[in-house]
Amino acid sequence: MAAVALNVSTLKPLGDRVLVKIAQQDEKTAGGIFLPDTAKEKPQVGEVVAVGPGKRNDEGKLIPMELKAGDKVLYSKYAGTEVKLGSDEYVLLAERDILAIVQ
C-alpha cells in the first residue's frame, strides 16, 4: 500500500465534522518566564479550516453546517481527535463539540 501524504487541502471532513487549526499558545509568561509543555493548558480556541456537508435528520434531509472556513471557534476541552499535519496541529471535531463562534 502506498503512503498518502496528508495535508490540509487533502483532508475533507465527513458528515457534521469540522477541522480546526489549534491556536498557538504563548511560549512565555508576561513576566518573561518560559513555560515547559507540561505547564501549558490545552488550548480550546482555533480557526475552522474545513467543514463537512452536514448531517441528515430522520427524514433524510441534509441539515447544513452553521460554521464555515475562517470562523474562530471555542470548543470543548477534551473533544475531538488531534491531528498533526506538517508543523501545525489540528483537531477534528463534531459540530456539537463547538461551543461558540468568537467574533
Curated annotation (Swiss-Prot):
This is Co-chaperonin GroES. Keywords: Chaperone, Cytoplasm. Belongs to the GroES chaperonin family. Pfam families: Cpn10. GO terms for biological process: chaperone cofactor-dependent protein refolding. The gene is groES. Heptamer of 7 subunits arranged in a ring. Interacts with the chaperonin GroEL. GO terms for cellular component: cytoplasm. It is found in: Cytoplasm. PROSITE patterns: CHAPERONINS_CPN10. Its main location: cytoplasm. Together with the chaperonin GroEL, plays an essential role in assisting protein folding. The GroEL-GroES system forms a nano-cage that allows encapsulation of the non-native substrate proteins and provides a physical environment optimized to promote and accelerate protein folding. GroES binds to the apical surface of the GroEL ring, thereby capping the opening of the GroEL channel. GO terms for molecular function: ATP binding; metal ion binding; protein folding chaperone; protein-folding chaperone binding; unfolded protein binding.
